[in-house]
A protein has these predicted regions:
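HotDog/MaoC-like acyl-thioester-processing domains
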Residues: 1-11, 90-157
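Hydrophobic small-molecule pocket/channel-lining residues, especially in calycin-type beta-barrels
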Residues: 45, 87, 132
């Protein structure tokens, strides 16, 4: 790669999930302990004014974090933030994407070494192109690992 600035603007291959189902919501409820009936009880959700049950916000945030950590490694993540934008409904297909917004020498920290601090803009959209959750993440990765990922992404593009 041609210097740290050569990473900025690089988009990684997206990953799609779904179509998501009510069963996915119930599985997530079991894992998270969020048993709000809006997410699994159709009559309850409709009575509350919704057209159907819908996903917990953290469901799609979890998909986005899973996507990001598959790219650059769970052990390398240093920061992850999200903003919820739209609800996710049964039948939605979600697509996660990431773009590098910054890459700089990591500094003098004990775990810095030859590492780069890499910032990503993250987005999860539905099949209509609406952003359901957006976010950002910061990773500490080696330049070699980032180059290898960039090369692999170029091959699959």
């Amino acid at each position: 790669m041609n210097g740290k600035s050569g990473y900025v603007g690089r988009a990684f291959p997206p990953q799609s999930f779904g179509p998501v189902t009510r069963t996915d919501f119930v599985r997530y409820a079991g894992a998270s302990g969020d048993f709000n009936p809006m997410h699994h009880d159709e009559p309850y959700a409709v009575k509350a004014g919704n057209p159907s049950v819908f996903a917990m916000g953290m469901f799609q945030a979890g998909l986005l974090s899973s996507y990001a950590t598959r790219l650059l490694g769970a052990r390398n993540i240093r920061r992850f933030t999200v903003r919820f934008r739209e609800r996710v409904w049964p039948g939605d297909t979600l697509t996660c994407s990431a773009t590098v917004t910054a890459a700089a020498a990591a500094g003098d920290g004990a775990d810095a070494g030859d590492s780069l601090k890499v910032s990503l803009d993250l987005e999860c959209t539905n099949q209509e192109g609406k952003t359901v959750v957006s976010g950002s993440a910061e990773f500490l990765v080696s330049a070699d690992a980032l180059d290898a990922l960039a090369a692999a992404a170029a091959v699959t593009a």
